[in-house]
Amino acid sequence: RRGGERLEGDQYPGGHYVTPCIATAKNEFDIVQEETFAPILYIIGYGDAKSSPRESVAELEEAMAIHNGVPQGLSSAIFTDHVREAEYFLSHRGSDCGIANVNIGTSGAEIGGAFGGEKETGGGRESGSDAWRGYMRRATNTVNYSTELPLAQGVRFDLG
């Protein structure tokens, strides 16, 4: 109630239920700075389609500073059509999370891979059969190259 706008998900506006919700948000909102386990997607946009490549990199670096500025680091995702942005997000300069995905949601993990969080989230990468690789500062990454936007583990937002 401090300036965000609910884009979808208002079935129970007065109840204590959490329906899937998509909302615009600002980095300074308390809820954005806290770890939330709910079907809520906060959208913090960045950049401009008309930006030059140099401006685009500066905008992405600013977005990554916001992204990595929170104390949690379990799972993250970027939605982009630009391979350069996806590669930056997955690189050592990009997402500081145990799981980093491109064009797919943040829930779920590749169980065979090392998974877990960074910073104040999770217990490192001690889970999964490849957990030893966590000591190599490696992240589990998923890139969706299709134009469909599937959610992990078959989750569906039926907002119709």
What are these regions (language model features)?
Residues P13, Y17-G160:
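Conserved C-terminal structural/oligomerization subdomain of aldehyde/semialdehyde dehydrogenase
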Residues R1-Y12, E28:
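Conserved small-domain helix->loop->beta segment predominantly found in fold-type I
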